[in-house]
Every structure is written in structure tokens, then in C-alpha cells.
Amino acid sequence: MENILLQPCYFSPIAQYAAILQSKHVCFELADHFQKQTYRTRCYIYSPNGKQLLNVPIQHAKNGKKTKTKDVKIDYQTAPWQKIHLKSLQAGYRSSPFYEYYEDDLTAIFEKKHHYLFDLHLDVHEFVMEALEEKCEFTKAIHKSAIISSSSKIGTGA
């Protein structure tokens, strides 16, 4: 696959990374309107108590207008979500082989205060690609020549 157009996600589903690894160039769609209750702000992990949802709180538009994906801001006032996510990952995976090799990088992601949701997505994406020892060329804006195929819709949370 030459190019792929994807919605940025928080710890994207594995199907999205499979599609990314099969493409030469990834374009993250940022000009679309943000949709609630998608993988853009949430991911699922396996914890000692079963499947667990991790959700990134966002600031909602006060004027009732739709917000573009690139303009979505993270809400740090509602809950200490970064501590919760990091502790959940530690509880679920600390005893897993090789977790210790990734723990410092994960901690750095969760200690950083990302202003925009997409900044968090980029850090997570770069972490995962580095952990997979893969390189990925990507664009942060709409790329009109991107080929949108059925496989490019995998993992969009829609």
C-alpha cells in the first residue's frame, strides 16, 4: 500500500499499526471534526481484573460548535488521568517480559503535559513505532493524494 489516511488514536488498535506497517506513508487526518467516544481519546488494556478502559479527558467547546481534531485540548482539571493510566499499565504489565525496557519511555509520555490531544497521539505513535523498531514517514495534515482504501479505515474507532 502506497499511502494511508488515518485518524490519530490514543494507543491505536493493533489493526491500525498493521495497516501503518504495510504503507509507505501515513497521513493523519486533522482537519475533520472531532468525534466523541472513539479511539481518539480511549484505549483498552488487559489488567489483573480483565479488560480496562483508559480515557483521556478533553476540554469540550463551550460555544457548542464542532472542534477540529487538531484543536482538541486535553483537560487536566477533571482527574489525574496520567497517573491513573501509568499505574494501570504498571499493574497490568510490570511482570511481563521486557516491560522494564519500555517503562521509562512510557513514564516520560505520561509525565509530559501535552496541551493538545494530537501532541499526545504523536508521542504515543513515535513510542510504539520505536518499540516495533520500525520507521514511519507521516504527515500531520490532509494529504490529498493519499489513497483511502478499506484497510485505511481499520482502527479508526468509527
Residue ranges of model-derived segments:
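Residues lining hydrophobic/aromatic ligand-binding pockets adjacent to catalytic sites
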Residues: M1-A158
